[in-house]
Amino acid sequence: MKLLHLYEASLKRRPKTTNAIMTGALFGIGDVSAQLLFPTSKVNKGYDYKRTARAVIYGSLIFSFIGDKWYKILNNKIYMRNRPQYHWSNMVLRVAVDQLAFAPLGLPFYFTCMSIMEGRSFDVAKLKIKEQWWPTLLTNWAVWPLFQAINFSVVPLQHRLLAVNVVAIFWNTYLSYKNSKVMEKDKVPVHYPPVVE
């Protein structure tokens, strides 16, 4: 309980910073889990600290801000005006918009960001999307709608991103695994741009 009170106090004082730290940490935990549960020893020998750093950077500097904004949009803009905010019809509407708009666009965005941070070309990002988008989206639809229905029904707006991030430790483990899977299968080389002095 004390941790929750500390989190709430921090969220009130510095909401963006608190969300960034929590989201980055939980994305990092997801990647650590993925590397320990699904090692890619054929490509990389040992633990890949840079891969975890990329997950933390994506979570803290990119997803935390997008996720926070997205949940505010869903809460403040996506609802039936003639129904109370927490009416079941608004929950269904928010889950539908989340799963039919955010999820299909968020996955290619994630794979593209990861490819860029890995120093790879857009062709690699396209390959990841081609290979992983549809199966990952199907898994997303098997996992997230029920949780989001609960999230939109009972979790206060300021805690929705945290609720998603805690459950997303398992999802981020899966995403990190899927992101690395194409690289392991195809052994796509890293293409760094030339250094200009």
Curated annotation (Swiss-Prot):
Q: What's the encoding gene here?
A: SYM1
Reply yes or no: does the keyword Lipid metabolism apply: no
Effect upon mutating residue 54 to Q: Almost abolishes function
Q: Which family does it belong to?
A: Belongs to the peroxisomal membrane protein PXMP2/4 family.
Q: Name one GO cellular component term.
A: mitochondrial inner membrane
Annotated TM spans:
20-40, 55-75, 97-117, 137-157
Q: How does it sit in the membrane?
A: Multi-pass membrane protein
What subcellular compartments does it reside in? Mitochondrion inner membrane
What is the recorded name of this protein? Answer: Protein SYM1
Biological process, per Gene Ontology: ethanol metabolic process
Q: What does this protein do?
A: May be involved in cellular response to stress. Required to maintain mitochondrial DNA (mtDNA) integrity and stability. Required for ethanol metabolism and tolerance during heat shock.
Q: Which UniProt keywords apply?
A: Membrane, Mitochondrion, Mitochondrion inner membrane, Transmembrane, Transmembrane helix
Pfam families in the record, alphabetically?
Mpv17_PMP22
What's the superkingdom here? Eukaryota
**Additional record remark:** Present with 1870 molecules/cell in log phase SD medium.
Q: Does the keyword Transmembrane helix apply?
A: yes
